[in-house]
Design a protein with these regions (language model features):
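N-terminal glycine-rich phosphate-binding loop and ensuing alpha1 helix
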Residues: 1-39
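Residue-level signal for inorganic ion chemistry
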Residues: 9, 77, 199
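Conserved beta-loop-beta/alpha segment of the NTase-like Rossmann-fold superfamily
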Residues: 35-107
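A feature for the membrane-embedded catalytic helix bundles of lipid/isoprenoid biosynthetic enzymes
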Residues: 96-97, 101-187, 262-376
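Alpha-helical transmembrane segments of multipass membrane proteins
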Residues: 192, 212-216, 340-345
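Membrane-embedded alpha-helical segments that form the functional core of polytopic membrane enzymes
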Residues: 200-256
Length: 376
């Protein structure tokens, strides 16, 4: 069964690895070794196949089995979020007791990890395994988490599962229009791209190209040219969400990809502001727009360099955040693009440059101030 471009088994394994589990075991009902199909699904991962009658890692992990070991059991029909699996790995639980939820996910802390692995190798279904372990260790309820996992009952649940996964891709740090308009479009595109071989980096380059193509249209003072450039700018912003969505959806995140995405986005902003400045200078025959443009570009690059680490972490503000931190957060959103579209429809995109020449340096100073207050 394939869910959002990945076989469900591989998705479960990659989520477990992303959650920080040191070992991921996959139970195979195939006797006499792992099934070749499972081997292909696990290719490139650190997962090990657990077959009937075999208990891999027991000997090599001998010293570790004497200590308390956290084991999470997940049926093959449950689509997990990595953060949910991480919470199962880290939460405090009563030892030597099986904690289970309605989706047949279970967690146990035990010094007898070998017994759990042997039972997992012996029983072919999650229901049988959970029943046997509950009889041995006793049972306790594990709080159900509809946000953290999606239980599939049949192939017909594939579309709802994909919708659930896509909704989880919406970031904490998003403006109103980005969350309620752009994300709806980008997620629809990502849903169709997920089964293909299109990579996140490829989408970053497509988005970058569209944004850079749109920038020169702001050299003109004609409304139709400016509006076309603004619509390309908006298209860039929408498609800019697809690369990160694909990366998170298919576990393809990388530092290289995050850097390419972040600086590609800011390169488009610099190009748009620079072209607005040159266009206004050509229209007025004055040099001061070039100074305003230079100030905006320098502040944009400085703000990007300063804020890049926090932005890529996707951290949300706490409830007790100061008003300056909240104001800096609000300035970082890209809802300003819609103002560019409206102004461009009247041939007044240059007005936005005037606003940006004040707002962008202000944002940069706010970042410096917030950072200084946090260090104090």
């Amino acid at each position: 069964m394939v869910v959002a471009g990945l076989p469900l088994l591989r998705r479960i394994v990659l989520a477990g690895i992303r959650a920080g589990f040191s070992r991921v075991l996959v139970r195979s009902a195939h006797q006499g070794g792992a099934h070749p199909g499972i081997d292909r699904l696990l290719d490139g991962t650190s997962a090990v196949t657990l077959t009937g009658g075999s208990v891999p890692l027991t000997e090599s992990a001998g010293p570790g089995l004497a200590a308390l070991t956290r084991i999470v059991i997940l049926p093959g029909n449950v689509v997990p979020q990595a953060r949910w699996l991480r919470s199962l790995r880290e939460r405090r639980l009563e030892a030597e007791r099986l904690h289970g939820d309605p989706a047949m996910a279970a967690v146990i802390d035990t010094v007898d990890a070998a017994a759990v692995l042997e039972a997992a190798a012996r029983y072919e279904s999650a229901e049988e395994l959970i029943a046997a372990l509950r009889a041995k260790f006793g049972g306790a309820e594990l709080e159900a988490d509809a946000i953290g996992r999606f239980r599939m009952s049949s192939p017909a649940d594939t579309t709802p599962a994909e919708t659930w996964l896509l909704r989880s891709l919406i970031k904490q740090r998003e403006g109103f229009m980005s969350r309620h308009f752009e994300r709806k479009i980008s997620l629809a595109i990502t849903r169709r791209l997920a089964p293909t071989r299109v990579t996140p980096d490829a989408m970053t380059l497509v988005s970058l190209a569209i944004g850079l193509i749109g920038a020169p249209f702001f050299l003109s003072s004609e409304p139709h040219y400016q509006l076309f450039g603004a619509l390309l700018f908006l298209t860039h912003s929408i498609l800019d969400g697809c690369d990160g969505e694909l990366a998170r959806l298919k576990f393809m995140e990388s530092p290289h990809g995050a850097i390419l995405d972040f600086w590609g986005d800011n390169a488009v902003h610099v190009a748009v502001f620079a072209c607005m400045a040159v266009g206004l200078s050509l229209a007025t025959g004055a040099a001061w727009p070039l100074l305003a443009g230079a100030l905006t570009v320098v502040a944009t690059v400085g703000s990007a360099a300063f804020a890049s680490r926090q932005t890529m972490r996707d951290t949300a503000l706490s409830d007790d955040a100061t008003w300056t931190a909240r104001l800096a957060e609000a300035f970082s959103h890209r809802d300003f693009i819609y103002l560019v579209v409206v102004l461009s429809a009247f041939g007044k995109a240059y007005w936005f440059l005037m606003l940006a020449s004040v707002g962008t340096p202000t944002f940069f100073l706010l970042l410096l101030w917030v950072s200084a207050r946090r260090r104090a």
